[in-house]
């Protein structure tokens, strides 16, 4: 969102601005994840706790912008001004679905699958994840590979955030992530380093999460049932 704000009112084509916003999101995610990786490697901080800590910092920075310099005049709903449509990824008419965002997600799954299953780098990466000490004894630079894994994860996290702003929400608002990070932890553990099954598992979890609101209205069931099923 911040990258797009830099170009509002300029003559830069909307498509180029969207591309720059996505690249900015990717680099932001990579840097943020690298900080967590450095804490893990050189401070012994568990990646989950380190990630949660940095999430709070990121939320604080975002809130200071949303309620500060990026706040629209006369509005106090914790949301920035809606982006102009030229800065939106194309959507299927009548829906919130962006085929561009969906296509990028599919390409991401394929790329990760190829890296983990079809490259020497991926083999080493999995070895480090399975047994760090044994990998080190075999001559693999474990610290470097651990940091690279964090950077790759940050790349996709930043890409996801950029696509969420340009392809779906079109604003930056409080709690924009909707707890997807915690959902991602469960999906990742269930997938067990199998990228191809990550997408269907994520689809099921998101369906349960989004359908929770309709349980009370349509089926007269407690909306917390979806949380019980996910747990």
Report the location of each language-model feature:
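Helix-capping/transition residues at the boundaries of transmembrane alpha-helices
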Residues: 40-42, 116, 190-191, 218
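Transmembrane alpha-helical segments in multi-pass inner-membrane proteins
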Residues: 23-25, 151-230
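Transmembrane helix-bundle core of multi-pass membrane transporters
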Residues: 47, 51-118, 223-225
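Hydrophobic core segments of alpha-helical transmembrane domains in multi-pass membrane transport
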Residues: 2-3, 26-31, 55-63, 101-114, ...
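Juxtamembrane membrane-interface segments at transmembrane alpha-helix termini
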Residues: 3-10, 36, 60-68, 212-221
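Membrane-embedded helix boundary and interhelical linker motif in transport proteins
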Residues: 1-34, 64
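Helix-loop-helix "hairpin" substructures at the membrane interface of multi-pass membrane proteins
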Residues: 95-171, 195-196, 200
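Transmembrane helix-loop junction
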Residues: 5-6, 37-41, 127, 191, ...
């Amino acid at each position: 969102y911040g990258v797009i704000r830099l170009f509002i009112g300029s003559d830069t084509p909307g498509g180029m601005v969207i591309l720059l916003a996505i690249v900015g999101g990717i680099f932001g995610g990579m840097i943020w994840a690298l900080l967590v990786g450095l804490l893990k490697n050189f401070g012994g901080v568990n990646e989950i706790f380190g990630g949660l800590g940095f999430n709070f910092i990121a939320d604080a920075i975002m809130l200071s912008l949303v309620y500060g310099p990026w706040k629209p005049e006369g509005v106090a709903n914790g949301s920035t001004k809606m982006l102009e449509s030229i800065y939106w990824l194309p959507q299927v008419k009548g829906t919130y679905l962006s085929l561009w965002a969906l296509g990028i997600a599919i390409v991401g799954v394929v790329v990760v699958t190829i890296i983990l299953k079809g490259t020497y780098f991926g083999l080493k990466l999995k070895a480090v994840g399975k047994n760090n000490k044994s990998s080190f004894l075999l001559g693999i630079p474990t610290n470097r590979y651990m940091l690279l894994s964090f950077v790759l994860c940050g790349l996709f996290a930043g890409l996801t955030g950029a696509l969420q702003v340009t392809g779906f929400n079109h604003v930056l608002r409080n709690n924009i992530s909707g707890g997807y990070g915690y959902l991602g932890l469960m999906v990742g553990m269930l997938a067990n380093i199998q990228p191809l099954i990550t997408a269907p598992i994520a689809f099921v979890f998101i369906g349960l999460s989004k359908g929770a609101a309709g349980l009370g209205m349509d089926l007269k069931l407690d909306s917390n049932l979806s949380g019980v099923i996910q747990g």
